[in-house]
Amino acid sequence: MKKFNNTIIIGIDHGYGNMKTANCCFPTGLIAYNCEPLFTKELLVYNGKYYLIGEEHKEYISDKSLDEDFYVLTLAAIAKELSTESITEANIYIAAGLPLTWTSGQKADFSAYLMRNKEVSFTFHKQEYHLHIEGVSIYPQGYAAIAPYASKLTGVNVIADIGNGTMNVLYMVNGKPKSGKMFTEKFGTYQCTLAVREAFMQQTQRELNDHIIEEVLRTGKADIPKSDLAIVRSEERRVGK
């Protein structure tokens, strides 16, 4: 979050696994209700609906503007970032990203999607927020990470941005991106989770929760039987080859 004159600039990474800002990170998922749910710790209320933020896992969609979910998750991300400085009303400029090869084709629609309401009010964590969205800029994912020092790169460099839903690869030659050598593949870490889940089900006729699989992928262990852990670790190694 940066302040420029009377505007707050907030960078948001709309990941398939996690929503991220400079100071916050939370799972990309939500559940919508028509009335207030029993548990309200991560409750966002917007446009007459109740959303539990961070619940479930949003399934992969190639166009993030196709439904309401990423808009609501954006509101939550802004609120979480503003809450670090106890701000509840502000002029906001959103800086967001899209996968490399999708940026040109989708940036106009995604920008309009995030700008759909220039004035927006909602409640998050029982706190009211009032925002004026002044503008949106869309940038290519991955490249943004090295942009500040790209001119210092020499020779051939390969930038790999491996996310939950996609993997972006960009070739750089003497600090300049090669437009003809950039790729976006639907092969992120969640595909590994799905492969492990399917293999486990085939071998045991039981379903293993994604959270347990992800814990094993991150730490190499989980509170499950040793035989189950062995299946997960074996499939993890197979997929990772």
Model-based region annotation:
Residues 1-159, 174-191, 203, 210-241:
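Nucleotide/phosphate-binding catalytic cleft detector across ATP-hydrolyzing
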Residues 162-168, 237:
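Ser/Thr-glycine-rich phosphate-binding loops at phosphate-binding pockets of nucleotides
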Residues 171:
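A short helix-loop
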